[in-house]
Amino acid sequence: MTVSLGFTTGQIVQEFYVDDDSDETLREAVEKSTGEKLVDDEYGDVVDGAIVWWRSDDAEEEDLADLLVDAMSNLDDGGLIWVLIPKPGRPGAVPVADVEEAAKVAGLHTTSAASVGPEWAGIRLTARSRNR
C-alpha cells in the first residue's frame, strides 16, 4: 500500500537522506506522478517539494530542524515537505512529536500524517509564504 504524497505532473521533488532502507515503491510512485526523476540534496535549483527520509540514527549526524531549513532553501512558495519516518516498532523509529518540534523550530507547519507504505509513516509540512 503506497499513498499519494500530493505531487503532480511536472513538479520537481528533492530528496534528502535516501538510503538502502527507503521505500523504492514510494519513490517510483512519486516519479510516476510527477513524470520527473527525484533530485538529490545537491540539486541547486528551485523545487516544488521535498522528501526527507529520517531515522533515529540520522539525529546523530544532523539536527532535523537544520535539515528542514536546508530543504526549504530551494522550495518554491506553496511547496510541500514530507518527513518520512519508520513506523513505531521498526528499526530507526522516531516519535512524531520530535518531527513536529523540529518543524516548529524551522518555521514549518504540520498539516497531516499518513501511512505511506508498509514500513514508513509520513508527516506533511508546509512552509510559510515568502511573501509575508
Regions found by a protein language model. Give the residues of each.
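S-adenosyl-L-methionine-dependent methyltransferase catalytic core, i.e., the SAM/SAH-binding region
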Residues: 1-132
